[in-house]
């Protein structure tokens, strides 16, 4: 079975939940193709980049024409089927052609499943799976179903009608999706975020009575929605009250410089360390040596 996983950007090294999914599917014998942009943090031989345009208007126009001609020669029936599906959804012809270009790299492949790893990546790709006679599924994660629809009302209306199956990381997110129109007749699977409890269990229960310095730990992507800046603000209050503590933050992401600035502004340079990305085997010792694990919610 051939599965296409659709990303906006390929998973970073800290997005272990996605990397583990890819690895697990391949271990079970599935043929996995990745569609996205950016750099892949781990080697994967089957990656396909989203179409990109460069140069002035004339150059971009030529690029679009060449891509569409190649697609029409390679997959004429799927291409016309896609346009027909778009038009039946009320999409203007010019926008249907734009979407055909946007999805040309997916339509040109033969897939059994098209899975959108983040819900919002399905926008303008609602008809891709049906056009290539594949089944469509998606994952419900926090931002894409809790915040994105608030900014883009009705964005998933067409999506729900074309889904074969839904994966959610919680019952709450699934309930939120139903408020936005997901019907109960679409099969859904709840797979909660988890860890290997056998690997991360302590070999022996150490004395966890607090020492002179309280040791905090967070393992997280450095992203605004993880609330790390609020965590730093809370810890600064502890420092003002005279508590001694250290705080290790493991992970990488786009907010590193902003968080470093916040650390400096809050006078936490001696207390807070940004460890960066670590492999799982190197994270275990941090858990064992910490007193309290912090997770913003």
Would you name each region that the model predicts?
Residues 9-10, 219-224, 253, 278:
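Short donor-sugar binding/catalytic loops of nucleotide-sugar-dependent glycosyltransferases
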Residues 36, 138-141, 153-202:
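Donor nucleotide-sugar binding/catalytic pocket of nucleotide-sugar-dependent glycosyltransferases
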Residues 100-109, 131, 135, 143-166:
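Membrane-proximal helix-turn-helix segments that form the acceptor-binding/catalytic region
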Residues 116-122:
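Short His-centered aromatic/hydrophobic patch
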Residues 167, 204-226, 232-237, 248, ...:
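Conserved donor-binding/catalytic core segment of Leloir-type glycosyltransferases
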Residues 277-278, 285-290:
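Short alpha-helical donor nucleotide-sugar binding micro-motif in glycosyltransferases
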């Amino acid at each position: 079975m051939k599965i296409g996983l659709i990303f906006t950007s390929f998973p970073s090294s800290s997005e272990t939940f996605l990397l583990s999914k890819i690895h697990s599917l391949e271990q079970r014998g599935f043929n996995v193709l990745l569609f996205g942009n950016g750099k892949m943090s781990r080697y994967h031989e089957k990656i396909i980049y989203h179409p990109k345009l460069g140069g002035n208007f004339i150059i971009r126009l030529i690029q679009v024409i060449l891509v569409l001609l190649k697609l029409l020669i390679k997959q004429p029936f799927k291409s016309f089927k896609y346009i027909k599906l778009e038009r039946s959804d009320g999409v203007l012809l010019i926008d249907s052609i734009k979407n055909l270009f946007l999805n040309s790299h997916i339509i040109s492949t033969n897939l059994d499943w098209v899975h959108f790893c983040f819900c919002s990546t399905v926008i303008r790709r609602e008809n891709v799976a049906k056009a290539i006679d594949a089944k469509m599924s998606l994952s419900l994660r926090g931002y894409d179903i809790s915040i994105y629809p608030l900014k883009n009302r009705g964005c998933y209306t067409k999506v729900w009608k074309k889904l074969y199956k839904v994966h959610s990381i919680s019952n709450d997110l699934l309930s939120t999706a139903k408020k936005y129109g997901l019907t109960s007749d679409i099969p859904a699977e709840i797979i909660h975020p988890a860890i290997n409890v056998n690997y991360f269990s302590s070999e022996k229960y150490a004395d966890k009575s607090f020492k002179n310095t309280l040791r905090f730990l967070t393992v997280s992507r450095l992203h605004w929605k993880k609330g790390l800046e609020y965590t730093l603000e809370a810890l600064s209050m502890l420092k003002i009250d005279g508590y001694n503590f250290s705080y290790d933050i493991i992970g990488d992401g786009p907010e590193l410089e902003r968080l470093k600035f916040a650390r400096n502004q809050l006078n936490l340079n001696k207390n807070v360390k940004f460890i960066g990305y670590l492999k799982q085997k190197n994270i275990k010792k941090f858990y064992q040596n910490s007193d309290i694990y912090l997770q913003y919610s």
